[in-house]
Amino acid sequence: MFKKQSRQKGREKRHLRIRKNIFGTPEMPRLSVYRSEKNIYAQIIDDLNGVTLVAASSLDKEFDAKGSNKDGAKLVGELVAKRAIEKGVTKVVFDRGGYIYHGRVQELAEGAREAGLQF
């Protein structure tokens, strides 16, 4: 009998497939998303140098909303975009981390776009 693959393992395999094609450069770094059950995290990464340029999450001190809902995800997107623009980053490559582009991941992306990031 075949064993059913867990959702987490499937997401990790999808993420590896996506990462083969997505690569962040100093001119156009990668906006990476991680979604846990209660929080959401976003970081902008320069893969060429292996450096995280900017990071934001629903656990930050500046963050006052709830991180487990869409409104919180949108605020995290706006926060990471604001910090990126302060560092001089305006264009990024979006890495959804193997998650479906729906719900909190979509809201984070839309919040970052509204705050001025281009992808």
From Swiss-Prot:
Signal peptide: none annotated. One of its GO terms (biological process) is translation. GO terms for molecular function: 5S rRNA binding; structural constituent of ribosome. SUPFAM superfamilies: Translational machinery components (SSF53137). It holds the Pfam family Ribosomal_L18p. Gene3D superfamilies: 3.30.420.100. InterPro entries: Ribosomal_uL18_bac-type, Ribosomal_uL18_bac/euk. Keywords: Ribonucleoprotein, Ribosomal protein, RNA-binding, rRNA-binding. GO terms for cellular component: cytosolic large ribosomal subunit. CDD domains: Ribosomal_L18_L5e. Part of the 50S ribosomal subunit; part of the 5S rRNA/L5/L18/L25 subcomplex. Contacts the 5S and 23S rRNAs. Belongs to the universal ribosomal protein uL18 family. This is one of the proteins that bind and probably mediate the attachment of the 5S RNA into the large ribosomal subunit, where it forms part of the central protuberance. This is Large ribosomal subunit protein uL18.
